[in-house]
Design a protein with these regions (language model features):
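Anion-binding alpha/beta catalytic cores of soluble intermediary-metabolism enzymes, centered on
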Residues: 211-472, 477-538
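Flexible phosphate-sensing "switch/lid" loops adjacent to ATP/NTP-binding sites
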Residues: 1-215
């Protein structure tokens, strides 16, 4: 994983030129593949003198065109779009780097209202910690610490942790109550660090942010998928969104893409859209060799259902069946479909062909709920209508495994309208039984149930209702008792809390197949392909 640090001025005239050069000199010696990235530029990048000076110090002037995120003007005009572009460009730039120093506000940049909160949001979305630059000129140690606390508080409000402060023009006899948090520059032209200061900088660089924003999580999906590229088949190549997503996935090297359809038509459609899918493999359902290979295998799999070879030949010409057979036969590592077809049309072939993996009680689904600063897992919100206690236990175990696969520590809450022993009745009994069975299936699983949603997420409520529970108040995986509750629940949180719902992610299959909403955006398709690729890596 790429190490990073967001270095930014907390005020004007902090002597950033000397500080930045000193930090770069140390980091480029410590990391073999080191990068410098400018979050926001002042107008055209070629006019950003401070950034060009930093790149020159790092010996990276040849990266000028790719080592920046957005412009300040674009950010003011449309923060959401600009932030998305920043994260995307940083994700691409940092790919393959050992460490990246991200530069925020520097001397000479306009000090505009909201500078620090904006910087904090950028750092949080880049999933990095912050190093503040301040001036120590004519300031006592206490005054510097007050200024640091005030600036850091602005950052923390935006979920960006500050781990070190670099102070220029500091007095020789400066007294700080917490010197371990500071690197001081008494000489404005200082270009070296003591061993102790190097250790502080190294600790800041190595410290990982625990905050996960929707943008940073989606960026992590891309990075993880890239780390071990998989072949993902997209059988609905007639849809323009699929071709646009394929272009982005191939350009960013997220996955190797297989498109199903007529090559001439697909390439002509791509040309009309202005996208490039030349690196994709294109296969046809009418390919005689593939059709026969898949038909023979499908007939074998379904012979007990009375499927003949002739029937199989026709069945595997269906896009969903063809794509699923590609995955089953090892010609692709996963499939994403549903932009045109219904959920049933997408997933029924996988039930018939790929089937459940060993130990999985059933195929179920979950949503990755991207909250403001963390990720939750909700299941089952899309597949299993009225699960039995045993099936509910299986959903809990599978959802916990999905959580682990996507970097979420699973603490499972088996949701109900009551907590602990406060409620009675068949609905509560079912959750009690499901919780017990889940513990049998995975004795190491942190799980609590029955539990109400507020007791699962609110530590104050948890202390009253379940004071000794390792899950209550800290749950990350939420299992709803049935599809009715689950679907309502995820949509309520999505709409009311502004959460980004990624999914549904199918779980329990031998090989990954995932379904798209028919209203999916290109971004949704890209994310789902990345998720499928990560599942295929397991």
């Amino acid at each position: 994983m790429t190490k990073s640090l967001y270095l930014t001025a907390a005020e004007g005239n902090v002597g950033s030129v000397a500080i930045v050069r000193t930090v770069i000199e140390e980091l480029k010696q410590r990391y073999t593949n080191f990068g410098v990235f400018r979050a926001f530029t002042n107008g055209p990048i070629e006019h950003d003198i401070a950034f060009k000076d930093a790149l020159d110090a790092a010996g990276l002037l040849d990266e000028l065109d790719i080592a920046w995120g957005s412009t300040r003007q674009a950010f003011v005009a449309d923060e959401e779009e600009s932030m998305t572009e920043l994260v995307k460009r940083y994700t691409d730039y940092s790919h393959g780097k050992d460490a990246v120093l991200i530069l925020g506000f520097l001397d000479g940049d306009p000090l505009t209202p909201g500078m620090l909160p904006r910087t904090g949001r950028a750092a949080a979305n880049l999933s990095t910690t912050v190093a503040l630059m301040l001036s120590g000129a004519l300031r006592s140690g206490r005054e510097i610490e007050v200024a640091t606390r005030l600036s850091a508080a602005e950052m923390v409000k935006e979920h960006a942790p500050v781990c070190v402060a670099l102070v220029s023009s500091a007095m020789e006899d400066l007294e700080l109550s917490k010197p371990e948090r500071y690197i001081t520059f008494t000489d404005g032209e200082k270009t070296y660090l003591t061993d102790e200061e190097k250790a502080k900088l190294q600790a800041a660089m190595e410290k990982e942010s625990e905050v996960v924003t929707p943008l940073s999580f989606q960026a992590s999906l891309i990075s993880r998928a890239r780390s071990d590229r998989k072949r993902i088949v997209l059988p609905e190549a007639t849809d323009p969104r699929i071709l646009q997503a394929a272009d982005e996935l191939l350009t960013r090297e997220v996955a190797d893409i297989v498109l199903v359809g007529d090559a001439e038509q697909i390439n002509a459609h791509a040309a009309e859209l202005g996208v490039d899918v030349s690196k994709a493999r294109i296969v046809s359902v009418d390919d005689p060799e593939l059709n026969e290979k898949y038909a023979v295998e499908f007939a074998r799999l379904r012979q007990k259902k009375g499927v003949t070879l002739e029937q199989a030949r026709e069945t595997v010409k269906d896009l969903s069946y063809f794509g699923t057979m590609m995955v089953h036969m090892g010609d692709a590592d996963g499939m994403v479909s549903g932009a045109i077809n219904t959920t049933a049309h997408t997933i029924v072939p996988s039930f018939q062909i790929i089937k459940t993996k060993p130990g999985a009680a059933l195929v179920s689904s979950c949503f990755l709920m991207l909250m403001e600063d963390r990720v939750y897992v909700y299941g089952d919100c899309a597949v299993t209508t009225n699960p039995t206690p045993e099936q509910l236990a299986g959903i809990a175990v599978s959802s916990a495994e999905t959580a682990v696969a996507f970097g979420v520590e699973p603490r499972v809450a088996m949701l109900s309208y009551s907590t602990g022993t406060s409620g009675k009745g068949p609905d509560v009994d079912a959750v009690v039984e499901a919780t017990a069975r889940a513990r049998e299936m995975n004795p190491d699983l942190m799980i609590e149930g029955p539990i109400q949603y507020d007791a699962a997420v609110d530590e104050a409520v948890a202390k009253t209702k379940l004071p000794n529970s390792p899950v209550a108040g800290k749950a990350t995986v939420f299992i709803f008792p049935n599809l009715n509750a689950g679907n309502i629940g995820y949509k309520a949180v999505q709409r009311s809390a502004g959460a980004v719902a990624v999914g549904p992610v199918l779980q329990g299959l031998n090989k990954p197949v995932n379904d798209l909403s028919r209203g999916a955006l290109v971004e949704d398709i890209v994310n789902t392909v990345a998720i499928t690729a990560i599942q295929a890596q397991a």
